[in-house]
Amino acid sequence: ILLDVPERGYKVKRIVVYPYQRFSLQYHKKRTEHWSIVSGTGTITINDKEYDVSVGSNWVILPKAIHRATAGGTDDLVFIETQIGNCDEDDIIRLEDDYGRVETK
């Protein structure tokens, strides 16, 4: 976490996705995320559409948009994530996860 200002509703993180790894397929109910790619290449999925990403790419993920980031090649995919809105961890709804973090009800 680079910056966390909960009373103002924003948080800034440096996110690293290791080569050939991916994040959970997830969405948020109450936050918008801005992703700025600073290193590496990969793909992001937003609402069933895949996009190639590289250094300089910028993306906006709106509330309820289903999304994930995947690193490609042999380098880490690194991006700066700015969260606006409800930045609590309980606003992460995981649909698929390679690490067993999907909650079933």
What are the roles of these predicted feature ranges?
Residues D4-P6, T41, V60, R68:
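A structural signal for the main folded, soluble domain(s) of proteins
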Residues L3, K13-I15, F23-K29, S36, ...:
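Short histidine-centered beta-strand/loop micro-motifs
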Residues R8-Y10, V17-P19, N58-V60:
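Extended recognition/assembly regions associated with phosphoester-bond processing machinery
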Residues R22, H34, T41-T43, E50, ...:
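Structural motif
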Residues I1-V12, R22-L25, I92-K105:
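A short, N-terminal "cap"/entry segment at the start of jelly-roll beta-barrel domains
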Residues R68-K105:
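Double-stranded beta-helix
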Residues N47-I66:
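Short acidic-glycine-tyrosine-enriched beta hairpin
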Residues I15-Y18, Y27-I44, T82-G85:
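Short, conserved beta-strand element in jelly-roll/cupin
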